[in-house]
A protein has these predicted regions:
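Cytosolic, long alpha-helical scaffolding segments
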Residues: 1-195
Length: 199
């Protein structure tokens, strides 16, 4: 029976590693297949992609927090910084791809309300990318702190932890709003297509 448990552990560990690896590779989940049959459906897919973008960026911020609390110069410290650096590149590419997709949607047949949605979604994408940039700049600041051999006292560390807590809460709220917008739009589009099919 023990051999079965060991095999199970190996399988689970491998699956977790694969998921972890996939998440750190550039890939679009909802808009990689191109435009859909209607502009409304295309916008819905873009909203889902933006929501995923927000989640990835929040994960990146969590890495910065881990970096700050990790022992400087350790192997784990270097690995975390490398992950942040990789996420920053992914963030840049996601912004470009989402923006290109939205511009393609805007070039098609789109209502005035739809054009306003595209404009708002482009702004969201730019702001999320800016958060990713800020995360990377924070990580680089931690590296410079290490190189300069600067030490923070207990008071400064508490203030930094408080700021991390507040920003984490803000990102939680941001992603909650993005998810709610996505769900509301999904329900609306589904109902519209159902009514169209009935008539």
């Amino acid at each position: 029976m023990i051999w079965f448990v060991n095999l199970y552990v190996k399988i689970v560990t491998r699956v977790i590693k694969l998921k972890h690896s996939d998440d750190e590779e550039f890939q679009l989940k909802f808009i990689s297949g191109g435009m859909l049959s209607t502009s409304e459906l295309s916008l819905l897919q873009a909203k889902k992609e933006i929501a995923l973008y927000g989640q990835r960026t929040q994960r990146m911020f969590g890495m910065v927090k881990d970096l700050v609390h990790e022992k400087e110069g350790s192997e784990t410290f270097s690995k975390i910084y490398s992950r942040i650096e990789k996420y920053e590149k992914i963030s840049d590419r996601m912004e470009l791809e989402i923006a290109a997709y939205l511009n393609q949607v805007a070039d098609g047949r789109l209502s005035y309300d739809g054009k306003l949605q595209v404009s708002a979604m482009l702004t969201m994408t730019t702001e999320i990318e800016s958060i990713g940039d800020s995360c990377f700049h924070l990580a680089r600041t931690v590296i410079r702190k290490q190189e300069a051999k600067v030490e923070f006292n207990e008071g400064i560390e508490k203030d930094i932890d408080l700021m991390f807590k507040l920003v984490s809460e803000a990102l939680d709220n941001m992603n909650l709003i993005l998810d709610k917008n996505d769900m509301a739009e999904s329900d609306s589009v589904s109902y519209t297509h159902l009514r169209a099919h009935e008539t």
